[in-house]
Amino acid sequence: AYPAAHQGYPAHVGYARVGYGGYPSYGYPA
């Protein structure tokens, strides 16, 4: 499992990247 994207995360579909706060976002809507 992975942490859900929080509001304000720059998320890109198909890409795992670190968003604000250091948590990864996996294609979740910002």
Swiss-Prot record:
The keyword Repeat applies. Sequence repeats lie at residues 1-3, 8-10, 14-16, 19-21, 22-24, 27-29. Residues 1-29 are annotated as: 6 X 3 AA repeats of [GA]-Y-[PAG]. The keyword Repeat applies. It comes from the Eukaryota. Keywords: Repeat. May be involved in the remodeling of the basement membranes or of the vitellin membrane of the ovarian oocytes. This is Glycine-proline-rich protein. It comes from Schistocerca gregaria (Desert locust).
